[in-house]
Amino acid sequence: MKKNFFEFSDKILSASDAAMKKAALKFAEIDEITEYNQQKVLAAFIHNRVSEADFAGSTGYGYGDRGREKLDSIYAEAFGAEDAIVRHSFTCGTHTLCVALFGLLRPGDTMLCVTGKPYDTIHSVIGLSGNGMGSLKDFGVKYEQVELNLNGLPDLTAIEKALEKKPRMVYIQRSRGYSLRPSLSVAQISEIAALVKSKCDAIVMVDNCYGEFVERTEPTEAGADIIAGSLIKNAGGAIARTGGYIAGKKELVELCAYRATTPGLGKEVGCTLGENRNMFMGVFNAPGVVGSALKCAVFAAAMFEDFGFKVTPSSSESRHDIIQALCLETPERLVEFCKGIQSGAPVDSYVVPEPWDMPGYDSKVIMAAGAFILGSSIELSADAPLREPYAVWMQGGINFASAKTAVMLAAEMLSKEGLI
């Protein structure tokens, strides 16, 4: 006998059934991409002859850590890059991006962001906020940006004009951040990279957070020179406990490695302290976990479309990251939605989220995140700045069944309050 563990109302059960039927074709497409990416990662493991001995951790300087070296090689192969540096010592995505930016840019260089203003958390790295903290601006690196066009897409004409100033770096943020603009496809990134290469010798860097394994190819296979991301997002597969990666052209990765450690030492040092096994398991499981997260996003889009809300991307649109934005129109709905997501978490389900002043953001933020790894956004989470357009951005889901249940609980919470 089928048991209704969470006492869902008939309204929400019917909405769930309708959303599942609506999402069926997109789910099949996600399964195909997941299988392709899983085979790609498996091939990288086999080519690199991974063994039990590679999981042993090193201490001290970390000289000769074979596991660390093979993990770098697996990431490079999976991402179609010449080289990679994957380290648990990268504390978050912002830190990893910061290492890459400081590794590649020098005083007098110009960083040109061609996808509008980047994530709030990177502003203080660039020098858009804060003074005297050691930002790129403090070290004489100039910053310019090209706004997106009215459709939220890269403005190629404006980018071409900006390239006349010969920037040292063209920076692309693949994901949407706290905006409703579309995430960028690898094909769109390729188009930007081709334009850049035709006009100057700038480094094309991509913030790849939330985008790994969503498509069959990565930006480094489509013209990007360097990419960076977090291991507590897609690439860590909900198993890596911390860390980040940088992948791309060998000489550029080397420069980033010199920044991550010291000039002259680079990738040759850095003990792994027993984290190798988790990091290997994480990237191996990443394609499947990303597939589950994508299904959760499509399911949520389908359900909330049927409730009459604007969602982006829609349940039928192509996906280029794992993020789903739901425009819930009022702060009350944001709060109740996040309470519902939190109530469906395996960890801290009893906690009631409240808006708070989160470091790095310019408005109060409410977050739902009951994760095994603190701050993980490949595990189901939702965040919403309490500002117009009162949208919530949700992402992640270790497995689809549990993530789907949490979305249903969020809908139930809204329904009980008379908000849908």
Model region roles, listed by residue range:
Residues 2-24, 31-32, 40-47, 51-54, ...:
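Conserved PLP-enzyme active-site core in the AAT-like
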Residues 58, 78-81:
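Flexible linker/loop signature enriched in Pro/Ser/Thr and Pro/Gly
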Residues 58-59, 85-88, 322-327:
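Short glycine-rich or small-residue beta-strand-to-loop segments that form or flank ligand, phosphate
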Residues 83-86, 109-112, 168-169, 202-204, ...:
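Structural motif
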Residues 305-420:
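Conserved C-terminal alpha-helix-loop-beta "cap" of PLP-dependent enzymes
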